[in-house]
């Protein structure tokens, strides 16, 4: 299963760990979207930045 992740808030003033989590998800700019495989590594990073992103499941 895949998920679509969209960065909805900017990175200014955010913790370094949150910035690293977003970089590992491939998100750098606001409103950027990525389609990722649903696996434990991705879900762990999403948990760290759940307040900055919007997540949807895709088929």
Curated annotation (Swiss-Prot):
Q: Name one GO molecular function term.
A: structural constituent of ribosome
Question: Can you name a GO cellular component term?
Answer: cytosolic large ribosomal subunit
Output the GO biological process annotations, alphabetical, semicolon-separated. Answer: translation
Q: Which InterPro entries match?
A: Ribo_uL30_ferredoxin-like_sf, Ribosomal_uL30_bac-type, Ribosomal_uL30_ferredoxin-like
Keywords of the record, alphabetical order, are:
Ribonucleoprotein, Ribosomal protein
Transmembrane intervals: none
- Entries under Pfam families matching the protein: Ribosomal_L30
Q: Which family does it belong to?
A: Belongs to the universal ribosomal protein uL30 family.
Question: HAMAP family, per this entry?
Answer: Ribosomal_uL30_B
Assembly mode:
Part of the 50S ribosomal subunit.
The protein in question is named: Large ribosomal subunit protein uL30
Organism classification = Bacteria, Pseudomonadati, Aquificota, Aquificia, Aquificales
